[in-house]
């Protein structure tokens, strides 16, 4: 690991430590089997990705960050927060299907952090870019925002029933006592397609 990479990894670790309490406050603690073991840099990759490399501990993961995340402070914060939120309910399966609920939650976390650090203007430009480039993520965020407006504790309640959020079912919504429009619930539980 080069000196430059060591500095970047140290910055990532500081960001993660600083934001973990806020992420857990919003969405609950990580699933009991989840284990984060550090960051690594990849100058070639286009986006952050979780790496599952330990067969004896399938939910143990590293976060591999692209060098391009460091080109912009807003993007860096968004990328780190998104991977931190995913890390609450890591998905090691190769053929894993995420849901609108999961992807919207991930974006929601990033938006909250951007708003706190950089303000409303940065949130607007981030959401506009999302709407133009990857509308499926924008839509997922919108539905999760509806859910959390109705019940700010909804994700925490759901994850108390099913810690791995991508496995949440309609029955879990009922068990968690979450009152939400049926159509919104159905959309949240759909398989996510970007």
Language model region names:
Residues 69, 91-98:
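A short glycine/serine-rich beta->alpha loop
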Residues 138-194:
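Pan-zinc metallopeptidase signature
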Residues 18, 79, 101, 105-109, ...:
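Extracytoplasmic/secreted proteins, especially bacterial periplasmic and envelope-associated proteins
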Residues 24, 28, 89, 110-118, ...:
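Sec-exported extracytoplasmic/periplasmic mature domains
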Residues 1-70:
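Auxiliary, metal-adjacent structural segments of Zn-dependent hydrolase domains
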Residues 74-94, 103, 107, 111:
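Active-site recognition of the HExxH zinc-binding catalytic motif
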Residues 98-135:
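Post-HExxH zinc-binding segment in Zn-dependent metallohydrolases
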Residues 10-14, 71, 75, 79, ...:
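Soluble non-cytosolic domains of exported or imported proteins
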